[in-house]
Swiss-Prot record:
Transmembrane segments: none annotated. The gene is SPC97. Pfam families: GCP_C_terminal, GCP_N_terminal. It comes from the Eukaryota. Keywords: Cytoplasm, Cytoskeleton, Microtubule, Nucleus. GO terms for biological process: cytoplasmic microtubule organization; meiotic cell cycle; microtubule nucleation; mitotic cell cycle; regulation of microtubule nucleation; spindle assembly. This is Spindle pole body component SPC97. PANTHER family: GAMMA TUBULIN COMPLEX PROTEIN, GAMMA-TUBULIN COMPLEX COMPONENT 2. Interacts with TUB4, SPC72 and SPC98. Belongs to the TUBGCP family. GO terms for cellular component: cytoplasm; gamma-tubulin complex; gamma-tubulin small complex; inner plaque of spindle pole body; microtubule; mitotic spindle pole body; nucleus; outer plaque of spindle pole body. InterPro entries: GCP, GCP_C, GCP_C_sf, GCP_N.
Amino acid sequence: MEIKEVDDRAELLRYTNNIPLLGKLVNHQPLWSTNPKLKSFSLEKISAPDQRRVQEALVVKDLLNVLIGLEGTYIRYFNDYEPSDPETPIEFKIAKKMDPSFKTFSRRIVRYGKQYMILTRAYEKWSDTSFGMVLQRFAYEIRRFLEDVYLKTLVERLERDFNKVPNFSIRELEQIINETEVNKQMELLYNIYEEIFREIEERRTNQSSQEDFNNFMDSMKNESSLHLRLMVAFDTTVYPVPKGGAILKIFQQKILENLGDRSSVMFLKKLLNNISQDYCTMLYEWLTQGILNDPYQEFMTYDDLEGKTDNIFDTRDRAWDTQYFIRKDVLLRDCDSEEDKNLLFKMLRTGILLKVVRASLQIPTIPSNSSDITIQEINDFADLMEGSNLELYVDKCYSRANEIFLKLFFQGYDLINVLKHLQQIFLGYQSGHNVLKFLTKNMGELTKHYRNDNNANYDKLLQNFELERQSENPNNLMRQLLMIQFDTETLPQVLSHYLQIYPEVPENNSANDDSDPLMHANNFKNMNAILFDELSKERTGAYHGSNLELYTPKSAIYHLKFDINIPYPLNIIISRTCMIKYQIILRYQLVLQYHSRLLDETWMDLNKTPSWKYRGYSHTVKRRIVRATRVLHAKMNHFIKTIMEYFNQNVIDKEVYSLEKCYRNPTLAVAIQNELEGGLTNIMTNRCLSDLIPLQLQIFDIVYKFCKFIKSMRAKLCQLDPVLYEKHKSGMMKTLNEGYRTNNGGQEDVGYQEDAALELIQKLIEYISNASSIFRKCLINFTQELSTEKFDFYDSSSVDAAGIERVLYSIVPPRSASASSQR
């Protein structure tokens, strides 16, 4: 061979700022295609049988070079290979004139050199921090294997035998490679590399935004049937590089594929344990301390507020419900199926509970003796992923987190006492009479029609409320935090938003389709357009059609509401959603109490006012006005009191009893949240607050107008009898007579007139008869709607059923009662 002079110097690269941790820092060797050092000896000249050993020795020497990523004389890189270009494919070409048998051996052995070069290129690239700690550690494991195992075998066995054994052949070279586990392990590493590379390429070539949207829609469809508190908030973003669990999942799959090969499984498990060390640390810290130390976004839990300075103690914010997500892109294999939602929920919830404890106590870590349960560090990730080990480990951590969390809330913050105070205020228990006392003292102001710009009257109400609160026990935190407000929306409007008791979409609207329009969105832009359209229709009232009663001006009582901004950390259990439900329940009770007070006040008029107690009326007035008014008033009063009794005793008491039972031996924080939200939801969705509200509003309106009519009857009754008229002509009746003169065109009082009295009697009888007829019809409709026979889910043995039956038999008119019983 003729030696050529080639400039072959090793030197450091000039620009090394962006080179990964294990990246190449020196220049590449000269290529044969551009700078050949030798002029190769022709293989044709050594193809004779007696020269075959010489050719074999040359080929073996080339193969030893190829196995460490270098080209030889007769086995070279392709001419277009450029080592500085990472996108250039790595391929070797074999001399055409090589002995066919040597060429066959060479093709089989060359692939190990190709794999060595590809894996070398991979660990140089993946050692960058942008690929995350798991893939970075895998890059280190590749490098360690190539240097400590692969190259060691080449140097200590193959090169030594080639140099010292005279008859060392190409067959022996292949045999030694196959006898060791090196080739099998190299093959496994290369297969894993291919899987990771394929995943990276798919992410690079796919449209990430569309993939994100598809994942988001899948999550919406899959989670639509899950319980509110068991839903897991997913971050459906598809990241450009697979990280964390996405890499570990590939290793887990490879272990499953090689279960029949014990040595391969042991190698893969050891490799998996090594590359998962940082991940195990993150998992352990999250499940035992609620600490999320994820600098490269590869852990399954994602903190949406990381790096933000928002106040976590803001009572109006639901940060603890929305701060943490599960990255769907980096889930482990055992957490990736639809059946694993419960496991993911526990993992997410465990860290959140512990984070709340640390933030509340302002401590960096939770002492290990805070619970009776001891959690061991994760030292064998592969073993943790086998069978149900992960589920058992998470259950143990979840139980410990709940124990610490509940201990803080029940012993430290006295949660039971706080909830009792809320029940007293919002559910009408004990101290709730203070709210009712405020209602009684301000009946006049609350009867006036609500005006958003009339702040003077409402300031007076606020002052009265503050005076009432100053007399309260200062140790009652909830009472001190209680605020009175006037909502711009009436109670019926609020209920229509939350319970959809009114038909929200006209018949000709496309939203009446069986499927939700959002589910047919094609991308995020399309979804935004649909949501904007829905919001616009809601704001303009397009969905409410002919339900004008929603927007009819009403008394201030329909706008009155009480609110509490629950402080942190109590707002984690008593969320803003719970407080809105508390508000609605109390607003409904206030409306009932308001009309009950109206009826009580008019009862005083009916039974204490001289004009109503007068016994000298004619038979017609006694029977068809006085008696008919009292009977109708009694029916209205009985209806309101019956509904109040049913709502308090059969609806509220039942749910409060269930809540108190849950608080006695709490084991899970989510169970308390579910019971509280579920109990309030059951109260809110009771028929009194749902489909019966429109009928109740009609009845309330009739009651209000009839009470107003009774108030106006004092002067009118004095005009129906001459003796009563003369008796009250002076003194108290003076003002009423002036009003009567005004109503008669300002003429002077001409005394008792029988014709006018008879005409007034007829008008009063007609009004009372019409009011009684309308009330009776509303009552019949109410009882028909309340009838439980039309519901398949109705349980006749339940407490609620007994209450409904009592209400039916109590308020239904006699004829309707018999008809209802026959039906």
